[in-house]
Amino acid sequence: MNILAPVRRDRVLAELPQCLKKEAALHVRKDFHPRVTCACQEHRTGTVGFKISKVIVVGDLSVGKTCLINRFCKDTFDKNYKATIGVDFEMERFEVLGVPFSLQLWDTAGQERFKCIASTYYRGAQAIIIVFNLNDVASLEHTKQWLTDALKENDPSNVLLFLVGSKKDLSTPAQYSLMEKDALKVAQEIKAEYWAVSSLTGENVREFFFRVAALTFEANVLADVEKSGARHIADVVRINSDDKNLYLTASKKKATCCP
């Protein structure tokens, strides 16, 4: 019995969402990795469709982490600021290339007094979203420390990084241009994909989370295909080894029976 709710029509991804800036992207391919497309077409995605991928959202107090999540998950924007106490999370279900895929978006507190509590929930993340305020240089400078703290609980080689500038609607074109240069530099240094969004207007929010879902899905399928291939090779080696042992055993038996 399927206990999961059906995937919403606006959460179906048949193509790879593109990056915002090619100079600060995790990759610039126009399509999903060929091995991922092939695995989906041949229904060889293993347990990917049954897994829940964890995404943590970190950043300074009041940079707009909760508003970002709420705009995507609930299509709402609350002008009355309420600080997140500890952690909270939302579950979002997608269908990517015909395969069900779930993201668990963890909204963590930016307040120093809740940092220890929030950090206990960092472990096991497959993607880390570091949010800063496009109108606050200090919040951008603090992103590296947020990343350092998050990576203490995760393997840097197995996690996707996204650097997201929020409150774009409050920036003038000139202000945004200056901040974007600095943000792109930081994104390149930490090997993160850069995005600029507005939770108030919704600008780039949907596109951003679709990109997160697609790249996380792609990474999961590639990892599963790789594991399946490794298991297959191990089985072949084991079978060949067993065959060889059987041959040697038979030869020994034959030798002992000969005069």
Swiss-Prot record:
Catalytic activity: GTP + H2O = GDP + phosphate + H(+)
PROSITE patterns per record: RAB
Inactivation phenotype: RAB34-deficient embryos display polydactyly, and cleft lip and palate.
Chain residues that bind Mg(2+): 66, 84, 107
Location(s) in or outside the cell: Cytoplasm; Golgi apparatus; Cytoplasmic vesicle, Phagosome; Cytoplasmic vesicle, Phagosome membrane
GO BP annotations, alphabetical order: cilium assembly; cytosolic ciliogenesis; endocytosis; Golgi to plasma membrane protein transport; lysosomal transport; phagosome maturation; phagosome-lysosome fusion; positive regulation of defense response to bacterium
GO cellular component: centriole; centrosome; cilium; cytoplasmic vesicle; early endosome; Golgi apparatus; late endosome; phagocytic vesicle
EC number: 3.6.5.2
Lipid attachment points (S-geranylgeranyl cysteine): 257-258
GO molecular function, one term: guanyl nucleotide binding
NCBIfam families linked: small_GTP
Domain notes: Switch 1, switch 2 and the interswitch regions are characteristic of Rab GTPases and mediate the interactions with Rab downstream effectors. The switch regions undergo conformational changes upon nucleotide binding which drives interaction with specific sets of effector proteins, with most effectors only binding to GTP-bound Rab.
PANTHER family the UniProt entry points to: RAS-RELATED PROTEIN RAB
Function in brief: The small GTPases Rab are key regulators of intracellular membrane trafficking, from the formation of transport vesicles to their fusion with membranes. Rabs cycle between an inactive GDP-bound form and an active GTP-bound form that is able to recruit to membranes different sets of downstream effectors directly responsible for vesicle formation, movement, tethering and fusion. RAB34 transports protein involved in the redistribution of lysosomes to the peri-Golgi region. Plays a role in the maturation of phagosomes that engulf pathogens, such as S.aureus and M.tuberculosis.
Entry protein name: Ras-related protein Rab-34
UniProt lineage: Eukaryota, Metazoa, Chordata, Craniata, Vertebrata
